Amino acid sequence: MIDWKKIKKIDAHIHLMPPDVIEANKENGGNFIDFGDVRDYLEIMDKYNIESAFIMPFNDPYMLSMDFNVCTVHNNLFDMCGKAKNRLFCFADIDIRNDLERTIQILEDVVKREEVLGLKIHATNTAYPIDGMYYDEVFKWANKNNILVEIHSYPRIHLMDDVCSPARIKNV
């Protein structure tokens, strides 16, 4: 019988929070606040033999920064990865409130970092269709530059128009 705790693993989708976000939201509680610190997750990694993990942004700068800025989100992701080099990696964030040129410039700077594996797009959190023109240009840039794009989708059939439905994703 295989002991699951001893098998080496990669956790491909985790959410952690920077200390200032945790501190500012302590009274609200919730799993991201109560267990979202890097130290908490490193203990889990050690306990369950997780060799590396990929920190995912939310595409919502209000979740990973106190100044609600995607550049601060990236710095927070880098700081978290730096607490466990070669164990914690991350995906770049995107904030569609920025114009497309600014977004591409930010991404070009960020993907040069060794801890960045690619870009995460969470269309539901941005409330913008995954097959919309803004993302279309981001996908063109990513394809041209051989950048991995992770699309977060949880289809919801009760919606008339789901921005991250498989039908929309296949259009990308």
Protein language model features and the residues they cover:
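Short secondary-structure boundary/capping segments
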Residues: M1-I2, K6, M80-C81, V172
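Generic structural signal for hydrophobic
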Residues: I44-M45, V110, A142, V172
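Histidine/acidic-residue-rich catalytic or RNA/ligand-binding cores of hydrolases
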Residues: D20-K26, M160-I169
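Alpha-helical scaffolding within the catalytic cores
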Residues: F35-I44, C71-F78, I104-I106, P166-K170
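An N-terminally biased module of ancient metal coordination in phosphate/nucleic-acid-related enzymes
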Residues: M1-F68, T72
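Active-site gating/metal-coordination segments in enzymes
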Residues: D67-M160
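Structural recognition of alpha->loop->beta junctions
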Residues: K112-L117, P166-V172
